[in-house]
Amino acid sequence: LNKVPVSRMSSSTVGSLLSARGHFTVFAPDNDAVQAYLDTLAMKNIIASASWDGFSDSTTLDSIRKVIVYNSVINSGDNLPAYDVAQFPINDGGEFSKSNMYDRKLIVNYFDDPDSITINGALMDARNNNIRVLNGYVHCVHSVVAPTNNTLGYLLNKIYTEKESGYYVSSMLVHAVGMLDTLQRYRDDEYEQAYQTGQVPEMIAHESGVGYTTGKLPEHRYYGFTFFAETDDVWEREIGKNRFDITVDDVVSWLKENGYYPTAKTDENYHSEDNILNQFVTYHFLPMRLASDRLVLHWNEKGYSSQRKQPTVVQYEYYTCMGKRRLVKFLESAESDGVCINRFPKIDNSRRGSYHEISCDADKAGIKVPIPETEGEFNVRNGIVYPIDQIMAYTEDVQHNLHKERIRFDIASAMPEMMNNDIRLQYYSLGQRWGFPFTSQYPYFDDVFIGDESWFFYYNGYNETMKNYQGDELNVRGFLDITFRLPPVPADGIYEIRFNVQSEGHNRGMVQFYWGENKDNLPPMGIPLDIRTSGLERRTTSGTFPSNVGWERDTQDDDYNAEVDKKLRNNGFMKGAEIYCDGGQGLSTMARADPVIVRRIIVREPMKADETYYLRFKSVLDDQTREFYMDYLEYCPKEVYDNPETPEDIW
């Protein structure tokens, strides 16, 4: 500890850092663990002998010391707590929300026989853990925590070229479609340079007052990937050949024979997004690194407690896969027995229902997501591999089922950079906001285009009591001009796009929405929306006035409540969703019962599954003190919102 500097720019040591104020978690390897690590280095001929005297040069010695020390320490800073065992991620394969000093996420696994915990495969001592010190916790481990620096691309290429069993066929297919170079990426070095040299300027303060800081710019722009990979056992079962005898042609023939991707091309241009194999393989990848506790986010849905951390009502996420853009649905509930891919259960979603699963047909049960592969060489720096035991595909049945449901997504979930750079799902600290550069300064987001003088902030209300779906929100100060590339719709048809807004603030603004296919020439959608208007009031800096949009509190008469909902829809409004609390966890009042939380219907147009659509928000008030608020969007097909037999649910 006392021989490893805190950073390249500092002469202070990690030992000095751990003697100071703060909140630190240390996974300290015992002497036998360090010796075993030196033995491994000697076997790999990295050092001459398995001792500290076996290093031939100081550079290698310093590097190994840094690996051992940096990977052992999580610095939670001044505002967030250190981790005792009770605060470890509860999911098997879950990650600590804070990275270690090597900027790597550590993964926890739990075992029953005997009861034990590992940190990146390092067994934690059964007695010498949870050692409380003034500024944190120490947990003794029986091996050095040392994640590999390899990438997912390197791993899959190695499996393919060296014919390693387990994921040989899947890695062969990834190689065939030309994804390996993309999967090598882990950091945007151009952004590193821009950040370190001040090319990306500091943000303004989001609000004035004690404790409010400037928008914190991300230090890095990391890439990440999640791969749901069929095991070799699956392919042997489906193809009927030994895993090492299976060829790309075998898989393509099998896809055609089984009716997968019937509109795709069947030529040998596997790098093309129009190709059948390309569409099959890329659907297995998400452009973000998601540990098991981040596939479906839980925070303020009905009945959920972060103390018990047990799923309650049906909760879901919709992500866009890599390659040809298509939706992948992830669902977790009290009844689902973990996270499932493309699960479509029957839900108790009546007005007086529970929003729990009633049942699920076998052909709609989806794919159970198991514990990820995190041991040894699989613990790569830019990705996670989940082994799946059945074929994963974007079938016509999946598209049909997606087209029969309302698709709600937190706007931040459509921005992979939020997850890849530890911005989303972090604990709230007073006054802290993340800020992002204008696109002209640096394009931090692939799917968000930030105009000059649009000060774009992310407010992480996770573990707070804000009235936001999943706790967080995005907002903009200054002269608003933001364009989003939207996720795809699952099938051709007429859709509504709804925009959820919490209209409690007096400083909200008026916004013109634009929507269409040509990002640089989007037509306006209707008249500007005054997002200061709630269900009951219109709040302005000059006073509060009735909104007269038809909002009324629910009564015991559901027929009357349905009429109120129709009246609101006629005015372009909907009540908030019943699924989440009107604030933090454990509240008996849901968002639907709060008149300041409303959904605005901003688009009702035909949309095609193979088109890319954009949504632009532009302020119509010449007042840079106004604030634009964003929480979540909904796609709702006409078959749902205009269904006379089964009206859209309130959830």
Model-derived regions, located:
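Mature, structured domains of secreted/extracytosolic soluble proteins
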Residues: 1-651
